[in-house]
Amino acid sequence: MKILTVSDEVVERLYSLCQSGHFREIELILGCGDLPYPYLENLLTFLNVPLFYVPGNHDPTHNSDNPLAHVEGGSNLDLKVLRFKTFLIGGFGGCIRYRPDGTNQYSQSEAYLRAFRLLPRLLLNKINYGRALDILITHSPPFGIHDEDTHAHQGLKAINWLLHVAKPRYHFHGHTHFQRRNLSPSETTQGLTKIANVFPYKIIEVNH
């Protein structure tokens, strides 16, 4: 299955690529946060495939009754797990708290408490499907992987815990902006998991 993953920066060129049929094989869009919701809605309209997303630290608090606080037609996957085709996909939004009143920002302890809320569904998946998760999407990177020295871009240790417990085959995130000048790779393999920073977008083919 081919997935369009996006995060953190609007790439208007994607609109013309969508219209030209360049993405005709895309079956799913995954948003990893900090993108204007109209941008995600436009991609959804052009490709006419499901869209799952998690909020970033620059996104509003989710409110399904407020058209400005959710993606119309998309599914907010924060702290949720669902099955799409044959893939089990989970989401974890937000990043490390770097402002006292920051939206979708959490201390390391708060992030752990949020992550624990996914545990019952992960265990149920393990019983029903023999595996907890195939794909994990987050805004923040894990602690020590694709993160940065600045506090605002420090990874969340709770995501490391989720990777250890759920052992997904794929983990996609944003938040840290890998530019061409960066020497660090944007893809890493840890254990059974391929970890990819999808900024600003990547087309990824996933398999079981």
What are the functions of these language-model segments?
Residues V81-K85, N160-A166, F178-H208:
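Binuclear metal-dependent phosphoesterase catalytic core
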